[in-house]
Amino acid sequence: MSKGFLVSLEGPEGAGKTSVLEALLPILEEKGVKVLTTREPGGVLIGEKIREVILDPSHTQMDAKTELLLYIASRRQHLVEKVLPALEAGKLVIMDRFIDSSVAYQGFGRGLDIEAIDWLNQFATDGLKPDLTLYFDIEVEEGLARIAANSDREVNRLDLEGLELHKKVRQGYLSLLEKEGNRIVKIDASLPLEQVVETTKAVLFDGMDLAK
């Protein structure tokens, strides 16, 4: 790659994108791809501290706009400190959540103004968008059942939300897919992990023009 390539992974709770990423990493490294994997919120020290505030199960009183602004603050610091330098170094950067999460969760889920969210995303990123977004789609009930069955997963504040919010979030993602289908590729996350990994690999390699 002559320049960096930015990929974001998106999806409702329990879609399994983190597991897919863990399986993809050694495959990419075997290809000799210089890759950085990171996550939102978090990725850097300041971002991780903000993540703790956002996801703390005891912070049930958090206002929706406060939540949004915390995500945006984490996003900016993460980009400046970690993502942009990696892209400038020509690396493949794979982010577990990025700008679309704010639209899906705070826009569709919380009912905040989507134009305002778009403006804040633009402000925080200086207009940076992923070269490719992989959207892992799964029925809300199935995703939440996966979370409930995973005893290793730490419960966070979003896990405690009602079913209705998670359904709105999924609708938000499907709306984004319809609007930005040239950037966002839908992957059926209800399939067995091995199949999801293979599909993801094919889509990613095609997007990056890598030999399969």
From Swiss-Prot:
Entries under Gene3D superfamilies matching the protein: P-loop containing nucleotide triphosphate hydrolases
Pfam families: Thymidylate_kin
Disulfide bonds: none
Binding site for ATP: G11, P12, E13, G14, A15, G16, K17, T18
Record organism: Streptococcus pneumoniae (strain CGSP14)
CDD domains referenced in this protein's UniProt entry, alphabetically: TMPK (cd01672)
Descriptive protein name: Thymidylate kinase
GO CC, one annotated term: cytosol
EC number(s) on file: 2.7.4.9
Record-linked PROSITE patterns: THYMIDYLATE_KINASE (PS01331)
GO molecular function term, any single one: dTMP kinase activity
Keyword annotations: ATP-binding, Kinase, Nucleotide biosynthesis, Nucleotide-binding, Transferase
Catalytic activity: dTMP + ATP = dTDP + ADP
GO BP terms: dTDP biosynthetic process; dTTP biosynthetic process; dUDP biosynthetic process
Family classification: Belongs to the thymidylate kinase family.
Function: Phosphorylation of dTMP to form dTDP in both de novo and salvage pathways of dTTP synthesis.
